[in-house]
């Protein structure tokens, strides 16, 4: 069955078997593993997952792809297919019966147009997974793995560093896909970290506000929304003239702790 990729869904199907193998091998699967695949497409990765994992749960939005996947894998005892939108699906509810032992591994070749939205959802629900292997547009991987001081450092970089141990695995050329995209892709491994923040929503809010305008200093971004922002930065050991991309994860945590201790919240301006 031939079905054309839908541009509206950002579909680019991985077709190069060598890269399919590299993505699946990155998961280091055994027959005791449950794998959750987001966006199975025509099933290039799914085929290998069904062969190697004890259980494969796949979520796919496109009904045309559902028909292909059911035809290919419907008779497999270890395969379960969910026709739903990953952006609105409650992963906790979906994976609740298998997630408690943290043996769920997630894999996805994500459409470029929803990749950052999915990633932010995975940050919020990372406790469900033991390991996550994702394929993104290379620019996205460069951003999410950027360290303090790097030119690609941003809001998402800080959130990902706080949530995961990251490993940039390899690049994937445009020719590995059908249709051929205009940009390179890359694969990244994310291993969830335990939470160690007393107020994650505050941490996230501070980081977001500090990167609101990257060319501004952190003080100029924060002083309209936090009372005595300069003093709070100094108490945190942060030069108010620095820019947000230069701060380390520990400095973001210290700043969050200082705000908690001061009992000041964003929205209280000078």
Model-derived segments and spans:
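Catalytic cores of RNA-modifying enzymes
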Residues: 1-209, 254-270
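An accessory alpha-helical subdomain
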Residues: 186, 190-192, 198-231, 236-239, ...
């Amino acid at each position: 069955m031939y079905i054309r990729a839908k541009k509206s869904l950002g579909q680019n199907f991985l077709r190069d078997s060598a890269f399919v193998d590299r993505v699946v091998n990155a998961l280091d699967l055994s027959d005791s593993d449950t794998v959750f695949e987001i966006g199975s497409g025509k099933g290039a990765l799914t085929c290998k997952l069904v062969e190697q994992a004890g259980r494969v749960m796949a979520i796919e939005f496109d009904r045309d792809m559902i028909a292909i996947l059911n035809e290919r894998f419907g008779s497999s005892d270890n395969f379960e297919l969910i026709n739903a939108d990953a952006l609105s699906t409650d992963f906790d509810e979906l994976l609740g019966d298998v997630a408690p032992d943290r043996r769920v591994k997630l894999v996805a070749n994500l459409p470029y147009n929803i990749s950052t939205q999915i990633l932010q959802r995975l940050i919020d629900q990372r406790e469900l997974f033991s390991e996550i292997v994702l394929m993104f547009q290379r620019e996205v991987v460069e951003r999410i793995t950027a360290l303090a001081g790097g030119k690609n450092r941003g809001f998402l970089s800080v959130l990902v560093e706080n949530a995961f141990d990251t490993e940039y695995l390899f690049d994937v050329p445009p020719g590995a896909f059908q249709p051929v995209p205009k940009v390179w892709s890359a694969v990244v491994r994310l291993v969830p970290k335990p939470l160690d923040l007393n107020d994650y929503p505050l941490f996230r809010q501070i980081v977001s506000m500090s990167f609101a305008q990257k060319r501004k200093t952190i003080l100029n971004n924060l002083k309209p929304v936090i009372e005595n922002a300069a003093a709070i930065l100094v108490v945190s050991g942060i030069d108010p003239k620095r820019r947000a991309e230069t701060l380390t994860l520990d400095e973001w945590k210290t700043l969050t702790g200082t705000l908690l201790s001061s009992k000041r919240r964003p929205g209280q301006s000078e």
